UniProtKB/Swiss-Prot annotation:
Oligomer status and interactors: F-type ATPases have 2 components, CF(1) - the catalytic core - and CF(0) - the membrane proton channel. CF(1) has five subunits: alpha(3), beta(3), gamma(1), delta(1), epsilon(1). CF(0) has three main subunits: a, b and c.
Family listed: Belongs to the ATPase epsilon chain family.
Matching InterPro entries: ATP_F1_dsu/esu_C_sf (IPR036794), ATP_synth_F1_dsu/esu (IPR001469), ATP_synth_F1_dsu/esu_N (IPR020546), ATP_synth_F1_esu_C (IPR020547), ATPsynth_dsu/esu_N (IPR036771)
Cellular localization per UniProt: Cell membrane
Origin organism lineage: Bacteria, Bacillati, Bacillota, Clostridia, Eubacteriales
Function noted in UniProt: Produces ATP from ADP in the presence of a proton gradient across the membrane.
NCBIfam families xref list: ATP_synt_epsi (TIGR01216), PRK13446.1 (NF009980)
Transmembrane segments: none
Protein name listed in UniProt: ATP synthase epsilon chain
Any one Pfam family match given in the protein's UniProt record, by short name: ATP-synt_DE_N
Length: 135
């Protein structure tokens, strides 16, 4: 009996991942959420951070931006703005984005700028964290 479920990760630009997996761990606004075969149907908000995917007994990690996840009948669909494998992350670009976001947070002019800067900082830090694990 198979202990896998089907996972799809989609962005506006591409089908990032698809296939049978044993487990995933995603970041939500309330903490990490693990999914195994047979998980109850649910819809969840995905927060900026990493996704850990267990496939064929091995763990893989990628960075996801914000989005949504639907779990139903051993099929998980994740819709996010961006998704990147560690080898797709430009570390210098992520460091520059982090510095820009930190500077904007220091001189924020509006609530909207603050929210945008916090999101940009979270994306840059997630990229650097995952990239740092796989250098």
């Amino acid at each position: 009996m198979s202990s896998t479920f089907y996972l799809e990760i989609l962005t506006p630009e591409r089908k990032f991942f698809w296939g049978d997996v044993e487990s995933i761990i995603v970041k939500t606004p309330t903490g990490e959420m693990g999914i195994l075969k047979g998980h109850i149907p649910t819809v969840a908000v995905i927060d900026i951070g990493s996704i850990k995917i267990k496939k064929d007994g091995k763990w893989f990690e990628a960075v996801l931006s914000e989005g949504f996840m639907e779990v139903k009948q051993n099929h998980v669909i994740i819709l996010v703005d961006t998704a990147e494998w560690p080898d797709e992350i430009d570390e210098n670009r992520a460091r520059a984005a982090k510095a820009r976001a930190e500077e904007r947070l220091q001189r924020r002019r509006s609530e909207a700028e603050y929210i945008q800067s916090k999101a940009a900082l979270a994306r840059a830090m997630a990229r650097l964290k995952v990239k740092g694990k796989y250098n």
